[in-house]
Amino acid sequence: MAHEGYHEPIDQLSAPTRDMHRAIVSLMEELEAVDWYNQRVDACHDSGLKEILAHNRDEEKEHAAMLLEWIRRKDPKFDEELKDYLFSDKPIAHGHD
């Protein structure tokens, strides 16, 4: 799995590839944190703690959005796909018959 590290010898990977790996792994971690906080918010019975957990979850969403934007700016194909699918009213699976 990507979160376990590199799949190819690191000395054969360019600096941009290593940076992209860092960003992708970080994005995965942020999304995992959102999932964990969602579960904690659902399971929590203390309203004060629930509010803190929801706040923390939303900060993780901000981090994920920042990483996704960095990836978009660095990867032309991601840029193309995100511009096609995000913030659109088109069917999500458009273009796939």
Please provide the spans of the model-predicted regions.
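Iron-associated oxidoreductase/ferritin-like identity signal
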Residues: 1-97
